[in-house]
Amino acid sequence: EPYAKAFKLGLNSFEIPKEYGGNKVDLATAEVMYEEMGYYDGNFASVMQTTNLALKPILIGGTPEQVQYFSKHILEGKGYAAFALTEPQSGSDASNVKTTAVKDGDEWVINGEKCFITNGGEADIVCVFASTDPTAGTKGISAFMVPTSTPGFSVTKYEDKSGFRTISTCSLK
């Protein structure tokens, strides 16, 4: 499978710092690499780029342990990641996220729906944006790395696309 070979070559790790085993490069270099992959197959480039995009919030704001855990998961080719921001009610306006996350003991309970999520059907980790404090505006928006095996998580709709059919675009709940 081309994706497994790409993972072995490190094409899924342009955003992951070298200290975590990645091939971190500057943004311009990463974009040239994605563009070159896209000449071969746009779907292929999209899977690689979306996986890197989904890791970005944890790379920016996660603890070293979180970065290590999720980076290792991706680097070892254990699965794909998806980036879930877009919602039916607010589009991709990050300041108007309707999905909520409420702390319940040691866990967070996330409620809401995301739509048009690339890799959503294949991903085993989804970066989900949710409002944790509606009174705090954009500072009350948090990103959660959610395993798709989490009870209550589901793919609710697959989009019937005219192109890019190798990977899914779907709604998640």
Residue ranges and their predicted role:
Residues 77-85:
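A short, Trp-centered hydrophobic/proline-enriched beta-strand micro-motif
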Residues 10, 17, 33, 63, ...:
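Buried hydrophobic positions in well-ordered alpha/beta secondary-structure cores of metabolic enzymes
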Residues 4-78, 118-125, 136-137:
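Internal helix-loop-helix
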Residues 93-111:
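Cytochrome P450 C-terminal beta-domain/meander region
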Residues 56-61, 83-84, 95:
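Flexible, glycine-rich active-site loops centered on histidine and acidic residues
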Residues 107, 111-155:
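A short core secondary-structure module
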Residues 48, 89-92, 116-119, 133-135, ...:
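Short Gly/Pro-enriched turn/cap motifs at secondary-structure boundaries
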Residues 96-98, 149-173:
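Flexible, small-/acidic-enriched active-site or ligand-binding loops
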